[in-house]
Amino acid sequence: MENKKMSLWKQSKPYLAGLQFALLIAFLATILSNIITVYGPTRIKEMTNIIASGLETSVDVAAVAAIGAFLAVIYVIGLLSNYLQAFLFTTAIQRFSERLRRAIAEKINSLPLGYFDGHSQGDTLSRVTNDVDTAAQSLNQSLGTVLSSSLLVLAVLVTMFGMNWILALVTVVSTLVGFAFVSVFMGKSQGFFKSQQQDLAAVNGYVEEMYSGHNVVTSYNAIESTKEEFATLNHRLYDSIWKSQFISGIMMPIMMFIGNFSYALVIIVGAALALNGQISIGIIVAFMAYVRIFSQPLSQIAQGITSLQQASAAMGRVFEFLAEEEMEDESHKERQLSDMKGQVVFDRVSFGYTPDRTIIHDFSATAHAGQKVAIVGPTGAGKTTIVNLLMKFYEIDKGSIRIDGIDTKEMKRSEVHDAFSMVLQDIWLFEGTIRDNLIYNQEGISDERVIEASKAVGIHHFIMTLPDGYDTVLDDTVTLSVGQKQLLTIARALLKDAPLLILDEATSSVDTRTEELIQKAMDRLMEGRTSFVIAHRLSTIRNADLILVMKDGNIIEQGNHDELMAQAGFYADLYNSQFTEDEVEE
């Protein structure tokens, strides 16, 4: 994609809009601070010469005091300039990172479901949190420093060569030889910082995966194997962090050694020049200050470039995420559903998650208004895929899906989503009160309706046993069984009161008694709604108006339970095998 080929600077520009003035003021404050830093030693030189010339007669105390007072004033101004540029740079960088986070949040909502199916949650979360934070912290620590130090080095060079080219040459050559040596290390550090961010994402993803599946890991006695895998990933992260931080940490001591070496050379060469009468003592004193001023920003530049490389690696991952292909823009689609009856028609639908592999083949079926339609079949038959297409989570490759005669391709995704209530196999409840969970993103839901829906699915009594009833906050202190969580999600779907209903494995994780309660409530409350039920337990869908039997992405049988049993085909074999298994279990 074009965005991925763009430079980081070009990709960053939209997020810097409106911050240019603050950055300009920070830049000017940096220039002022550097001018003061460079100008100070020239006045110190004058002060030293005044004192040295007055040793044989008398020191001009008034002149020395005037220079001292002047230096105090300009150094205070320099201090304020430093604070101003640091404040403005920090503010701009934090605003930049805030905009990045906002862009990522908007991006998540515009990505197709296929992206999340193909990427681990840990990797995505690492880009949203760790990478943005790393970029912000690294930029905050280095951007102002590198800019200020670069300008300072330039100003010091001009001043030193204007004062004495011999001492200036000694300072520059001795310092740059060491800096060239350091640049070799910096060239290798970029790859290590990139590996650090990737390895951190891998560790986050693995921890999230093992935490969410902790019960399975424990039941299979796989704790030791997961420890070994984590140890491998953790050691890889340790290795990449160690390498990047070792190179980062060694630069400052090297540059300090170079600074001290240059300092000694300036004193030796300066003393020789002074003995020959070529320079004054004041120039030596000034150059002693300039050596420190010159070598320190070079050290800071080396350290800052390392941080910028770390920021570059992190921002590269963030912009890679922001450049992912989004869902189709549907702002031009205006078809809406009104006075819905609930008829759904699949007309020769074909679909594949990848272009080279078709999952659903020429699928056709009709669900009349108010019917209960069950979709059954072995694992991998395409049942859940049909629901994903029905909800427009994915775009179909061929054919059409029509709701009350309107092709879903002509409607916005939000319009299709509003037409459905949905209970997924994966239970999702957020940290908030039970009431907030039940009326999620819906307005005008009264407490009476909340209680009515809860009673309909048999969860009201349990809720009232909790200390705060419907105001109980669902967090780590509240323990709910899988069945209770599922009942809450079913009540939430019922409160939405949409004309179409999808139940994906809705009762597969509850006990028999709870399943019976749910089934009775569903049968009563699904009246007048077109319902699609996916269940591996065929006993739960015997009263369906239409059963679609799928295998390898095709409908191989359809009819009601009695008709399909009379055919003695694939459905009958599935049903009889489950019935036999249930008897054996009993």
Regions found by a protein language model. Give the residues of each.
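An intracellular "coupling" helix at the cytosolic face of ABC transporter transmembrane type-1 domains
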Residues: A17-G18, L113-G114, N130-L139, L143, ...
